[in-house]
A protein has these predicted regions:
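Conserved P-loop NTPase motor module
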Residues: 7, 15-17, 26, 232, ...
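N-terminal pre-Walker A segment at the start of P-loop NTPase domains
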Residues: 27-65
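Hydrophobic anchor at the beta1->P-loop junction of P-loop NTPases
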Residues: 76
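Conserved lysine of the Walker
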Residues: 84
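Hydrophobic positions on the alpha1 helix immediately C-terminal to the Walker A/P-loop
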Residues: 87, 91
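Loop/turn-to-beta-strand initiation segments
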Residues: 101-102, 173-176, 208-214
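Conserved nucleotide-sensing/catalytic segment adjacent to the nucleotide-binding pocket
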Residues: 113-200
Length: 310
């Protein structure tokens, strides 16, 4: 059996031979030799490549005019009366105005975007989005036909649980999920029970052109696996329910210390409330937990949440 010194001598000899040959450069560890293809990291700094990339992006945008750019998880946080839902609804409304071909999936009743689509099973066992009244399959061509008849038309699916994150898809045209009181679905007390399929959907939003927007009274109440995937946080504040000021926090750079978030503020937003903003949704609607189980896994009953906090 080779001693540690013998392993080191063998690794050094292998290192010298492969370095001269230029094939690969090994990394020496206590367990042996890990080979790394060194040439793959040698790239010339070609400035033309940057211009070619910009040209490619312009052409892509021209060929895909309805491509859905927003992605990642955004949380509006603040206590009751802080204007977090008002701010979040305003944010979602602006996105829907900018991207009319996107699908909205939410647990909030929007005045301008009534529920008009449902998630329904297909004969092959898969789930799809269909029109609530005609039961027609909703495709991009179907959406284009409706927009040609009514430019203010938007597809809106009622959120019915975490499964919607997987079932509602819209290709490059995007899906925006707005989940009010998101901590009721994914909270810190149940972080160990989060199914891997949920995290797959949350962590791959960019590839699927999905954007999750949620609200939470306490940011730290959200499950830790979810907090690790949050890109941005909006800390909401309201003065006399008239003036709103929000801090935009970089969720990826901010750190948690002693159960508190040490924010890295990257922006601010200010605006006055208006009757139009309040008319956009039912401000007194009560949110609920949608599923007692997800993918066959039972969830903690609501009354246990407070019992386990003590």
């Amino acid at each position: 059996m080779l001693s540690v010194r013998s392993w080191a001598q063998l690794a050094r000899a292998k290192f010298n031979s492969t370095e001269r040959g230029g094939v690969c450069r090994p990394l020496v560890s206590f367990l042996g030799v890990i080979y790394l293809y060194k040439k793959a990291f040698r790239k010339a700094l070609n400035l033309c490549g940057a211009f070619d990339t910009l040209k490619y992006r312009r052409e892509f945008q021209r060929e895909h005019p309805f491509y859905f750019n927003p992605c990642g998880t955004l949380i509006f946080s603040g206590p009751q009366g802080s204007g977090k839902t008002l701010s979040a609804v305003d944010y979602v409304t602006r996105i829907m105005e900018e991207y009319p071909h996107a699908i909205l999936c939410t647990n909030t009743e929007f005045t301008d975007y009534p529920f008009n689509a449902v998630v329904a099973p297909e004969p092959n066992g898969e789930m799809s989005v269909r029109d609530y009244f005609s039961h027609e399959l909703i495709t991009h061509e179907w959406i284009c036909d409706r927009l040609s008849e009514n430019s203010s038309y938007r597809v809106c699916v009622e959120y019915s649980g975490l499964d919607c994150l997987k079932w509602v898809n819209n290709g490059e045209y995007g899906v925006i999920f707005f989940i009010d009181e998101f901590h009721l679905e994914l909270n810190s007390l149940e972080s160990k029970n989060i199914d891997i399929d949920v995290m797959v959907e949350i962590s791959q939003q960019r590839k699927q052109r999905k954007h999750i927007v949620g609200t939470s009274q306490v940011y730290m109440r959200l499950a830790k696996p979810l907090r690790e995937q949050i890109k941005d946080v909006v800390d909401c504040h309201s003065l006399l329910n008239l003036f709103q000021w929000n801090y935009i926090i970089d969720g990826e750079k901010s750190i948690e210390k002693d159960g508190q978030l040490e924010p890295v503020i990257v922006g601010r937003s200010f605006f006055f409330h208006s009757p139009e903003m309040y008319r956009r949704y039912d401000t007194y609607a009560k949110m609920k937990r949608y599923n007692k189980e997800w993918q066959g896994r039972s969830r903690v009953p609501s009354f246990d949440l407070f019992k386990r906090e003590g």
